Amino acid sequence: MSFNSPFFDFFDNINNEVDAFNRLLGEGGLRGYAPRRQLANTPAKDSTGKEVARPNNYAGALYDPRDETLDDWFDNDLSLFPSGFGFPRSVAVPVDILDHDNNYELKVVVPGVKSKKDIDIEYHQNKNQILVSGEIPSTLNEESKDKVKVKESSSGKFKRVITLPDYPGVDADNIKADYANGVLTLTVPKLKPQKDGKNHVKKIEVSSQESWGN
């Protein structure tokens, strides 16, 4: 560009600097620069082939929400949120749910628990929810904690809230819990469905409108 004006010379200088910077990137001139690894933008799929959104990386912690198909089972659970957003830091223990003909089977992975006093299980009838909370002990002691180079095991307090389906209902008095090999198994019996309430829909007639015909 050949204009005898300082204004255009200024923009020419900027363009030249940008071109030089781009060439520097192409030649690997910024050797100290390494692009941050990011999750791929390609859609993820669940076990049924349905596309689901990938989790985002907030504050350096991977937010690992449970599959969208389980939204009806899990209530709002602070253990699923990453730390750094005002939520208390806790362990997000995995939960498996099996729907049998006569009962629900819940499996909560809580390794290292040495006493049943470290696990608390409650059934909240008003919300039809099972609340499992407790604490997973650390594998480290005072002597070894300063020598750790890599630690992938989780320890600390946990809490999971599982909402059960309203139908056919559950027999709360006969819920059983068993702990073995690091897995807490809850057996939740279902109530027998009523024969006359197969679809749970009852027709309600509207009355008291004198002008309506029979």
Swiss-Prot record:
Induction, as annotated: By heat shock, and under other conditions of stress, such as increased salt concentration and starvation.
Family: Belongs to the small heat shock protein (HSP20) family.
Residues with Phosphothreonine modification: 42, 163
Keywords carried by this UniProt record: Acetylation, Phosphoprotein, Stress response
PROSITE patterns with a match to the protein in the record: SHSP (PS01031)
Organism: Saccharomyces cerevisiae (strain ATCC 204508 / S288c)
One Pfam family cited in the UniProt record for this chain: HSP20
Protein's recorded name: Heat shock protein 26
